[in-house]
């Protein structure tokens, strides 16, 4: 009997206590609205700061000038992406810290299995080939907005670094990191089916992720929803945010490489 008691006690020690969600339902709604506002404000702030630094005096005398010329200037946009990244990553970490969470745990910043990584890379390649074929058949050119940026950037490497490496890092941190976790943890009670949280989080964050890409048309936005769902699936399968970040970098890298190959 003593041994049984001990065994049950040790069992209590080994199962970690269930973590209370960092955010209430209302909290998740406010977090989503707040993060989206922060997303747009940080972009504007980034363009303003970079515009002040980079644009010639004739183009940066008024705020309207800075936004008008800056948003079509490759160097300004590249720098604004980097400024935005720093601001948004800092805000995300701060929000988690304020709510008493562990950022590494909450954002799933941990290694993933190579097998899952290779499998997801395969899935991404299938998607990329399919969307490429569809883009060709429908005669779309989704990267038209890059033209003025490419033509005006001081170094094409700056544009590549900002769009291929930096943008995926903070976009994943927000959409498949902070918002995804905040939504998933609303569905941890036993009354919900096992995958309910992941499905809801994936659909909601993917739609929001697509909507923020205002520079695209409806066809491109629908492919972005599918792409975002693939990134969500990678987060679920690997239990890590690092895999979606890597896949996002591969995707943006392939798109940029193709754009440069066509432009050259």
What are these model-predicted stretches?
Residues 38-48, 199-214, 218-264:
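Functionally important transmembrane alpha-helices
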Residues 170-204, 233-240:
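Membrane-interface helix/loop boundary segments of multi-pass membrane proteins
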Residues 54-78, 98-167, 185-188, 259-260, ...:
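Juxtamembrane helix-loop-helix connectors linking adjacent transmembrane helices
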Residues 64-87, 154-159, 192-205, 240-243:
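Membrane-interface starts of transmembrane alpha-helices
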Residues 84-88, 159, 223-231:
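Hydrophobic core segments of transmembrane alpha-helices in multi-pass, intramembrane catalytic enzymes
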Residues 3-23:
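Short, Lys/Arg-rich, polar N-terminal cytosolic tail immediately upstream
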Residues 19-36, 110-121:
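Alpha-helical transmembrane segments and their helix-start/interface "positive-inside/aromatic belt" motifs
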Residues 32-96:
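Alpha-helical transmembrane segments in multi-pass membrane proteins
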């Amino acid at each position: 009997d003593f041994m049984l008691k001990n065994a049950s006690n040790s069992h209590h020690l080994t199962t970690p206590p269930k973590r209370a969600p960092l955010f209430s339902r209302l909290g998740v709604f406010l977090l989503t609205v707040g993060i989206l506002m922060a997303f747009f404000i940080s972009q504007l702030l980034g363009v303003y700061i970079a515009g002040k630094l980079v644009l010639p005096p004739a183009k940066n005398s008024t705020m309207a000038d800075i936004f008008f010329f800056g948003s079509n200037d490759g160097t300004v946009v590249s720098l604004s992406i980097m400024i935005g990244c720093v601001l948004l990553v800092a805000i995300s970490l701060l929000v988690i810290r304020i709510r008493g969470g562990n950022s590494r745990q909450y954002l799933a910043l941990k290694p993933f299995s190579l097998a899952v990584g290779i499998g997801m890379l395969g899935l991404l390649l299938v998607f990329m080939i399919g969307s490429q074929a569809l883009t060709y058949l429908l005669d779309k050119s989704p990267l038209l907005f890059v033209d003025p940026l490419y033509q005006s950037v001081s170094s094409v490497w700056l544009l590549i670094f900002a769009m291929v490496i930096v943008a995926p890092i903070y976009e994943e941190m927000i959409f498949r990191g902070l918002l995804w976790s905040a939504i998933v943890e609303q569905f941890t009670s036993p009354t919900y089916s096992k995958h309910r949280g992941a499905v809801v989080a994936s659909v909601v964050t993917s739609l929001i992720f697509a909507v923020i890409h205002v520079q695209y048309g409806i066809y491109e936005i629908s492919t972005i929803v599918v792409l975002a769902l693939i990134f969500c699936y990678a987060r679920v399968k690997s239990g890590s945010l690092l895999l979606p970040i890597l896949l996002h970098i591969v995707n943006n890298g392939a798109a940029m490489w193709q754009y440069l190959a066509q432009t050259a």
